[in-house]
Amino acid sequence: QKYGAVMWSGDTAASWETLRRQIPAGLNFCASGFPYWTADIGAFFVKRGDYWYWDGEYDDTVEDPAYLELYTRWYQWCCFLPIFRGHGTDCRRELWNFKGADGVFYQAMLRANKLRYELLPYIYSTAGKVWLYDASMIRMLAFDFPKDAKALEITDQYLFGESLMVCPVTETMYYKKSATGAEKQENPSKVRNVYLPEGCGWYDFWTNTYYEGGQWIEAEAPIERIPLFVKEGSILPMQQPANSTAETVMSGNLTFVVYAQKDCSYELYTDDGDGYAYEN
């Protein structure tokens, strides 16, 4: 806690099971007092290698549409981590290497990347609250909804900052691995069961549909988006994305999106984007 500025989950191997395990691992880690944690998008090892730990399931890497689907879902999840990073071996991780045959997965990742940039004022403000108030970047639902018995059992949804509930997709929908390669699924299910904690209402980030808390819903989860919900009474500061994080933060073109069924307020943290003045 004193010296670990940024931690990550280690050199993981690509599989859906690994992705599922990463989410509670990160939440438990951050619950112990480390605000900055991340994972290698798409796992560090993609192929099967000579050693026991080199145990990825995708020898064809970016040529395998099944891996492109897994990588896309991993990418969408990591968009809502304190540190957003593609890193690993076996294949290059620049986004344009993941275009595939029809570009569907590539476009889904571009959309997630754009959203990360749009949310930088929110992310930066959350980081400011970590510094100022010992807040957390990500946290399990039990922290905010301790009296909701169902929320206490949820391990694959979490809060990113104080307003966003992230619900990663951790099951394949489009391609199934087999002994002969990737099999495209006919009429795939494109929904994910999501629990909306009681005590407040929730807005679907993509559609602005309002839901009462304390219920399970089937959330739309096509490949182009991750189920994402905004807590009632939230204000989200957003910006138009630019060519870099620095340019985006410094552009000054702020938009405040208000999700109001009741009075609400928001504390925006900003600075000049350079130097150590924030320490004072």
Residue spans of the language-model regions?
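Edge strands and adjacent loops of beta-rich recognition modules
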Residues: 237-280
